[in-house]
Amino acid sequence: EIVLTQSPAITAASLGQKVTITCSASSSVSYMHWYQQKSGTSPKPWIYEISKLASGVPARFSGSGSGTSYSLTISSMEAEDAAIYYCQQWNYPLITFGAGTKLELKR
């Protein structure tokens, strides 16, 4: 089983601040996907196949990485970006998720 470790577990950013969330895999994976979850809702696909934005995701989000190291970046934090973000990989037949990164708005 491939273990995904996210960093940081919790972070806070001010409006306009750049935010980077990292996801480290215990062994190499071909693709990494990211989900956004807001309170009381199910996780939504956010970034797929490393860097492709899901429909409706703002262009301030981007994804990058390869091998065992991947990241999600927000170029300029907005209030609506406060959420929990999960990385996810599929190494047939097992799907594994990171424990999540809680992103809060720093006021």
From Swiss-Prot:
Residues 56-87 are annotated as: Framework-3. The keyword Disulfide bond applies. The keyword Calcium does not apply. Pfam families: V-set. GO terms for biological process: adaptive immune response; immune response. One of its GO terms (cellular component) is immunoglobulin complex. Residues 88-96 are annotated as: Complementarity-determining-3. Residues 34-48 are annotated as: Framework-2. Residues 97-106 are annotated as: Framework-4. Residues 1-23 are annotated as: Framework-1. Keywords: Adaptive immunity, Disulfide bond, Immunity, Immunoglobulin. It comes from Mus musculus (Mouse). Transmembrane segments: none annotated. Residues 49-55 are annotated as: Complementarity-determining-2. Disulfide bonds join C23-C87. Residues 24-33 are annotated as: Complementarity-determining-1. This is Ig kappa chain V-VI region TEPC 601/TEPC 191. The two sequences are identical. These chains were isolated from myeloma proteins that bind galactan.
